[in-house]
Amino acid sequence: MDKVLNREESMELMDLLGLERAAWGNLPLMRKAYLRKCKEFHPDKGGDEDKMKRMNTLYKKMEQDVKVAHQPDFGTWSSSEVPTYGTEEWESWWSSFNEKWDEDLFCHEDMFASDEEATADSQHSTPPKKKRKVEDPKDFPSDLHQFLSQAVFSNRTLACFAVYTTKEKAQILYKKLMEKYSVTFISRHMCAGHNIIFFLTPHRHRVSAINNFCQKLCTFSFLICKGVNKEYLLYSALTRDPYHTIEESIQGGLKEHDFSPEEPEETKQVSWKLITEYAVETKCEDVFLLLGMYLEFQYNVEECKKCQKKDQPYHFKYHEKHFANAIIFAESKNQKSICQQAVDTVLAKKRVDTLHMTREEMLTERFNHILDKMDLIFGAHGNAVLEQYMAGVAWLHCLLPKMDSVIFDFLHCIVFNVPKRRYWLFKGPIDSGKTTLAAGLLDLCGGKALNVNLPMERLTFELGVAIDQYMVVFEDVKGTGAESKDLPSGHGINNLDSLRDYLDGSVKVNLEKKHLNKRTQIFPPGLVTMNEYPVPKTLQARFVRQIDFRPKIYLRKSLQNSEFLLEKRILQSGMTLLLLLIWFRPVADFATDIQSRIVEWKERLDSEISMYTFSRMKYNICMGKCILDITREEDSETEDSGHGSSTESQSQCSSQVSDTSAPAEDSQRSDPHSQELHLCKGFQCFKRPKTPPPK
């Protein structure tokens, strides 16, 4: 490098390259610096043109001189140095020129004999064969495929694997796999010059994980890794011809019983079917209610207080049957899923019934359900008092004239479900009894109460509650423009007016619930209750009948003195209305399937509730007293129990009231209508005052 450039030029070049002078001769470093400085000094980049030219000159000169210095000296000569051929100078020059060449360097100019000139023996001789390269196997032997998993791309995890590789790599992998995966068993088997490694791991792994680990140790050698589906059958095949065992981690190898699972202890499972049957029998549609009710069955029957009281038929009737299953259910981790399936079964059965059963059959089934409940709570094990429910019958019968006919006509309306003649309207002021009667009818027939006072955008899911229901009640509908300023305004009447297709029942409508698909069906019939709001004509045309309620002071006082009616919700119970129908209506008005049961209940009412007792109940109601405050008197005549019409019963009550409650004053005795608690308050009087004499 010292002969390439002089000292001044080399120092100048190093300064231009921006390198230390000690780096002179480091050609790669100088090359990088040169390229970097070209970008810096280039005129197009805003650099110094003079420095660029000077650096290029010095660097090119250095490169040229370095190439010349590294070229070997072959003793070249020019044509002017060679003397003329044939002269003595040329002979001497030729001799001196050849002195440097090796004497052994000699080329024979004689040609070898060609293939055609070869002897006959050489033509027919067999040339030596080249050794063929043995191809690596592409898969396990075919007789082992039935024991191996053929999945290529799978996330399935296994605990048994087989590795097919060369004998040399198998010796290495045998130890590496044992250390890496802490195998429970591993063996190496000979297979056609190669080895198969069979091993079991304590934990499950993917085949790809085993393959990736082995592939690191088999760069050039072939490697095939697969999972094993039939562990013992594969191991047994590898120990027989044409395979044989080379080594294994357990002396004596594996036995068949090593792979047979131990017989676990028989664990009792929850009977989903039993829970579903309970939900269907009780018609439970609430998941959490079913969950809570069934968990109560886990306690001992003999110590159960509910069974001792026998006031809940859905408990004491089924406790003993479901006791064993409830104990297992209490320890289950999927209690909600079991109850959800049971509730879905109840809803599915209801949908099938609405599709295949007539409305009369559905109402008959509902009456049977109520009669079953009455048999329980009024039976030997029940704790309900029949007289209290008959007191509710007497109170409801005083609410409206011919109450039994009102209920009968309403049932006739919703059973036949005639389009545009399906809804009733209960209208009246506060505390007039419209909601009490509506709640009783709803419990008698089965259905849901809906709130239409919501904004229209929220009304969609509220109407979805009516899916597969027998009837609905639009409760306490609010409107605008009421005469009384005390009544709040609302959107209920406007919303009902927008739901004419729902009320008419001529076409099917779409009902939807959250997390459920839309259900297309005829909207169920029912009734509407409201205060004294004006009703538009378009909505009034949808009501087949309107009943106007008026508050009655004697009913309110009697209800206040008979608290058991409110505490036990007797007036809102469907059983009370059914008892009212049994008491007043003839047997022929009921469905044929339940007439025998109706006769039994009529006979029981004959024996337990006399006509005098029922008339005394109505008298106490008219006087505002406690309904069951009855002074029993023995009658000489045999009393006939309540098979009479409502008009006769009410007439008797009216006559008793007028006879026993006459005040001492002459003016009140002559005009019973002046009494505050007279029976005619609120409806037509059946005992009219005497006609005054002509003037």
UniProtKB/Swiss-Prot annotation:
Tell me which residues bind ATP.
428-435
Q: Where are the zinc fingers (T-ag D1-type)?
A: 267-359
Q: Where in the cell is it found?
A: Host nucleus
Disulfide bonding pattern of the chain: none
Extract one GO cellular component term from the record. host cell nucleus
What EC number(s) is this enzyme filed under? 5.6.2.4
| Region called Binding to host RB1 protein and transforming activity, residue ranges | 105-109
* Cofactor(s) of this protein: Mg(2+)
The transmembrane segments are none
Q: Which reaction does it catalyse?
A: Couples ATP hydrolysis with the unwinding of duplex DNA by translocating in the 3'-5' direction; ATP + H2O = ADP + phosphate + H(+)
Superkingdom field: Viruses
Composition bias, Basic and acidic residues: 666-679
Q: How is it modified after translation?
A: Phosphorylated on both serine and threonine residues. Small t antigen inhibits the dephosphorylation by the AC form of PP2A. O-Glycosylated near the C-terminal region.
- Which residue numbers delimit the DNA-binding region? 141-256
* Outcome reported for the amino acid change (mutating residue 260 to N): In strain: MM
Positions annotated to bind Zn(2+): 304, 307, 315, 319
Q: What is annotated about its quaternary structure and interactions?
A: Forms homohexamers in the presence of ATP. Interacts with host HDAC1. Interacts (via LXCXE domain) with host RB1; the interaction induces the aberrant dissociation of RB1-E2F1 complex thereby disrupting RB1's activity. Interacts (via LXCXE domain) with host pRB-related proteins RBL1 and RBL2. Interacts (via C-terminus) with host TOP1 and POLA1 allowing DNA replication. Interacts with host TP53, inhibiting TP53 binding to DNA. Interacts with host preinitiation complex components TBP, TFIIA and TFIID to regulate transcription initiation.
Function statement: Isoform large T antigen is a key early protein essential for both driving viral replication and inducing cellular transformation. Plays a role in viral genome replication by driving entry of quiescent cells into the cell cycle and by autoregulating the synthesis of viral early mRNA. Displays highly oncogenic activities by corrupting the host cellular checkpoint mechanisms that guard cell division and the transcription, replication, and repair of DNA. Participates in the modulation of cellular gene expression preceeding viral DNA replication.
Q: What is this protein called?
A: Large T antigen
